[in-house]
């Protein structure tokens, strides 16, 4: 087992990474204050892991709260089901909410914990690669709004993150690839040597080889923890973690939540960010193409939806958390391994990026 730390002073917390951690309640015990636990999961993950985790936490009074699965349910109506469960079971301020699932479950359970009785303890037990390397770390919680993704939420840090890498053995291939989009992101924004490692190990990762998965998760979480420790509330460097996300969120919103997985939309959005970085003269074509090939090798889409026009993108990107005083800030690459957040770019470069023929770009690789 490996243990990392998210350093936030008195609110610091550990990230445990290893095999079989669901069966080690002693890891979670120091982070549970009361006797009540609510395990929030979904209809897909609960049949696989709820009984196992509940048994490990048998010393506590465990309430299961099972939600419908998918991004389409990341909304007010589903959030209310968590509150309904907590109130019906008369959970008090010393309850601990445990998120058992992927990014949607983690975001909603965390938001519920932030709101319930003005804040109760919260533990992340992520079961997808995307949630293990990204969304479970850093305290971003929330739900979607019909007009924009993740527009209603709170920064609310967990007490601990427990990553049992064996849960990836039941992850569908498409979901695994979606998680690899976030892993690749870390190489692009802050760890160029990691890109080379990923190129050498992408087949091993897709084959679920334990050593490769553990290495990728550890390096990704270490990068995320360092950024969150330096900028918890995304006033500066943390925004670089959103490479590809502004374009990607536009895709998710336009296509309908859940039609494209988050990681798939981020992958296509990353290609657009690479294209814009190249058009600004910050990276060259060979570097753009190298990153696109890696995304392809991960089994990810690298072309935005054909039905989305530049006007569609502009409409959705106008409702983005990175819009400040009416100006859209974008995360781009100053060079491979170094990201920048900027609103200082010619509008014609953005328009050219939105209008680019990505099918032709990919065809020439």
Curated annotation (Swiss-Prot):
Which Gene Ontology cellular component terms are annotated? cytoplasm
Tell me the GO BP annotations in alphabetical order.
amino acid biosynthetic process; aromatic amino acid family biosynthetic process; chorismate biosynthetic process
Give the principal location in a single coarse category. cytoplasm
What is a single molecular function from GO for this protein?
A: 3-dehydroquinate synthase activity
Keyword Coiled coil attached: no
Which residues are listed for NAD(+) binding in this entry? Answer: 69-74, 103-107, 127-128, 140, 149, 167-170
Which cofactor names does the annotation list? Co(2+); Zn(2+); NAD(+)
**How are cofactors bound according to the entry's free-text note?**
Binds 1 divalent metal cation per subunit. Can use either Co(2+) or Zn(2+).
- Reactions catalysed, as given in the entry: 7-phospho-2-dehydro-3-deoxy-D-arabino-heptonate = 3-dehydroquinate + phosphate
Signal peptide per UniProt = none
Superkingdom of source: Bacteria
The chain's coiled-coil residues are none
Q: Which purpose does this protein serve, as stated in its record?
A: Catalyzes the conversion of 3-deoxy-D-arabino-heptulosonate 7-phosphate (DAHP) to dehydroquinate (DHQ).
Which PANTHER family does this entry report, sorted A to Z? 3-DEHYDROQUINATE SYNTHASE, 3-DEHYDROQUINATE SYNTHASE, CHLOROPLASTIC
Please report the name of this protein according to its UniProt entry.
3-dehydroquinate synthase
Gene name, please? aroB
